[in-house]
């Protein structure tokens, strides 16, 4: 393949992956915010921004709508779209580039081929995280910035820029990267399973009449997303709880310290708070990966691999 052809395919991968991600993430913003509120509620109670725990997904929706209005469900979505566009675009674009480096073919053995897919997916996700972590931090702080404890009260942050300004003033650059190490581990586990399993299972399951089926592709993507997100969810909780301590007097000494203290004070179940909402949110992730494949088939008559 010529250099021009490779660059053209790379640009198509980058654009289509990013657009699909941005659209899906915006559609899933309400459940995304509910997930973050439930996940971080114990930290929010400590900080005085939440007066009592949420009893479930529906109750969280009701309370948030009553206290903050329906539009508040998209709080933090701007940062999420800005973050998610390059994250997914880079993942989709570099996934195949990195996979090509391993040079494993299915004929060489399924286990070796599967391991190559797993490694390439994890590495692609880990690399993209280096560039967008501070946006993920800002999105988390905005989404978890509730004012339900005091109706009509002031929020901690007025917007994306304000998150950066206040965090840099109180904690410096380190504050924007709090929870980064467990994030790296989590992103490798999640993305490795996300891309690795999808690429490995797709040619086995989506064959014959199911090969170009949007529903079949969507269901496979949802199943893979659900499994990957559940497996890495405790790491996600630890990193976000660490993020919430930036600007606070008391902080965790590290990921292990956060894990130990959360389990000791709240029980192991606390690591999975919001997991139900996260599974529902996985519909968006499944939509992204299936839309990516379907758009390529519709526009170009094939997928770019």
Curated annotation (Swiss-Prot):
Region described as Important for transport activity: 239-244
GO molecular function per UniProt: ATP:ADP antiporter activity
Catalytically driven reaction(s): ADP(in) + ATP(out) = ADP(out) + ATP(in)
Membrane topology: Multi-pass membrane protein
Solcar repeat feature ranges: 8-101, 112-204, 212-298
Any one of the GO CC terms: mitochondrial inner membrane
Ligand binding (ADP): 83, 95, 239
Residues passing through the membrane, by range: 10-37, 78-102, 110-130, 180-201, 215-235, 275-295
Activity regulation, short description: The matrix-open state (m-state) is inhibited by the membrane-permeable bongkrekic acid (BKA). The cytoplasmic-open state (c-state) is inhibited by the membrane-impermeable toxic inhibitor carboxyatractyloside (CATR).
Record keywords: Antiport, Membrane, Mitochondrion, Mitochondrion inner membrane, Repeat, Transmembrane, Transmembrane helix, Transport
One Pfam family named in its UniProt record: Mito_carr
Keyword Transmembrane helix applies: yes
Motif Nucleotide carrier signature motif location, chain numbering: 239-244
Subcellular location per the Swiss-Prot or TrEMBL entry: Mitochondrion inner membrane
Family membership: Belongs to the mitochondrial carrier (TC 2.A.29) family.
Subunit structure: Monomer.
Domain writeup: The transmembrane helices are not perpendicular to the plane of the membrane, but cross the membrane at an angle. Odd-numbered transmembrane helices exhibit a sharp kink, due to the presence of a conserved proline residue.
Task performed by this protein: ADP:ATP antiporter that mediates import of ADP into the mitochondrial matrix for ATP synthesis, and export of ATP out to fuel the cell. Cycles between the cytoplasmic-open state (c-state) and the matrix-open state (m-state): operates by the alternating access mechanism with a single substrate-binding site intermittently exposed to either the cytosolic (c-state) or matrix (m-state) side of the inner mitochondrial membrane.
Protein name: ADP,ATP carrier protein
Organism this protein belongs to: Kluyveromyces lactis (strain ATCC 8585 / CBS 2359 / DSM 70799 / NBRC 1267 / NRRL Y-1140 / WM37)
